[in-house]
From Swiss-Prot:
Keyword Oxidoreductase in record: no
Origin species: Desulfitobacterium hafniense (strain Y51)
Similarity comment: family membership: Belongs to the bacterial ribosomal protein bL12 family.
Pfam families membership: Ribosomal_L12, Ribosomal_L12_N
Protein name: Large ribosomal subunit protein bL12
Domain of life of the source: Bacteria
Record-linked InterPro entries: Ribosomal_bL12, Ribosomal_bL12_C, Ribosomal_bL12_C/ClpS-like, Ribosomal_bL12_oligo, Ribosomal_bL12_oligo_N_sf
SUPFAM superfamilies per the UniProt record, alphabetical: ClpS-like, Ribosomal protein L7/12, oligomerisation (N-terminal) domain
GO BP, sorted A to Z: translation
Name of the gene: rplL
General function of this protein: Forms part of the ribosomal stalk which helps the ribosome interact with GTP-bound translation factors. Is thus essential for accurate translation.
HAMAP family noted in UniProt: Ribosomal_bL12
Record lineage: Bacteria, Bacillati, Bacillota, Clostridia, Eubacteriales
Length: 124
């Protein structure tokens, strides 16, 4: 009889309590867990629960230039490095993204500059 068959026969003869002790001994000896991995699958047609991840990249969207359009154009040029014509087209075409995929701190700083110039801004 092979070693595997002998071990299997020995395990067959154990009680439930003895098997539980054996599992604990294996976990301690080899540093493993006997817990079965849990696979979660969404049922067909069921909506998956949204994952609550913290957003790391933000888009700064100019919603409206407001009364201080010239100042907003100046700030847009400063932020983006665009030329006068391109910055004016961006401001005139609002709502449009001014900067995309920036950090939260950068997005808040850009928003503050644009709001100070008179614009309405959203950070998405």
């Amino acid at each position: 009889m092979s070693k595997t068959a002998e071990i299997l026969e020995a395990v067959k003869g154990l009680t439930v309590l003895e098997l539980a002790e054996l599992v604990k001994a294996f976990e301690e000896e080899f540093g493993v867990s006997a817990a079965a991995p849990v696979a979660v699958a969404a049922a067909p047609g069921a909506a998956a629960a949204p994952v609550a991840e913290e957003q790391t990249e933000f888009d700064v969207v100019l919603m409206n230039a407001g009364a201080g359009k010239i100042n907003v154009i100046k700030v847009v040029r400063e932020i983006t490095g665009l030329g006068l014509k391109e910055a004016k087209e961006l401001v005139d075409g609002a709502p449009k993204p001014v900067k995309e995929k920036v950090s939260k701190d950068d997005a808040e700083a850009i928003k503050a500059k644009l709001v100070e110039a008179g614009a309405t801004v959203e950070v998405k």
